[in-house]
Design a protein with these regions (language model features):
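Membrane-targeting alpha-helical segments
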Residues: 1-94
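Short flexible/disordered coil segments
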Residues: 23-33, 146-149, 153, 172-173
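Canonical alpha-helical transmembrane segment with a positive-inside/aromatic-interface signature
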Residues: 67-146, 152-171
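Structural signature of multi-pass, alpha-helical inner-membrane proteins
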Residues: 169-180
Length: 180
């Protein structure tokens, strides 16, 4: 009998077998499709990873769920993700439609408050990211970029090294006074 805190031995065995099978399927799919399957390169990749996790949890925890159906669903999501990534790579128009552009949040030690507002990022979050990246002074920060994945990249140096224009390619919200 299954209760809130206990489950029968047969249920536990089914869950353990489900874990073994579905994780084997995940490993096989990842080996076939490549590591990009779980890379957070775009918001679509992030959504795909969440969907994969949701399917995985459903199959493992719901003992009435078919392992074959779960495996097909996982394969389908990865296949669609691969197709979607290929199509957006080939078409700049589709890429710009479905992918967020990175946004400059800080440049040469100055916080770009207008861009913080546009991206709904708080100054405290920005400062926390600076600490996390071991930036010691605002003057050492060359740029902070909110990437299309939602991650923040902090480019800092104690030298007066100029940023290569290629590093800032595709970044929105670069101040007008910056000559790249």
């Amino acid at each position: 009998m299954e209760t809130w805190t206990f489950a029968s031995a047969s249920i536990i065995v089914k869950v353990l077998i489900s874990i073994l099978v579905i994780f084997s399927v995940i490993i096989l799919i990842t080996r076939i499709s490549g590591l990009r399957t779980f890379a957070k390169m775009s918001s679509f990749d992030f959504a795909s990873t969440i969907a994969i996790g949701s399917i995985l949890a459903s199959v493992v925890l719901n003992t009435n769920q078919s392992l074959l159906k779960g495996s097909i669903a996982l394969g389908g999501i990865v296949l669609f993700q691969t197709f979607f990534s290929y199509v957006t790579r080939k078409s700049k128009r589709l890429d710009s439609l479905f992918t967020n552009s990175p946004v400059m949040l800080m440049y040469e030690g100055k916080i770009l408050y207008e861009n913080l507002d546009k991206t709904n990022v708080g100054e405290d979050d920005l400062i926390a990211k600076l600490r996390e990246s071991n930036a010691l002074k605002f003057s050492e920060v060359r740029a902070v970029i909110l990437e299309s994945t939602g991650d923040m990249s902090v480019l800092h140096s104690s030298e007066t090294t100029e940023l290569d224009a290629k590093v800032l390619q595709g970044v929105k919200g670069i101040p007008d006074y910056v000559n790249l």
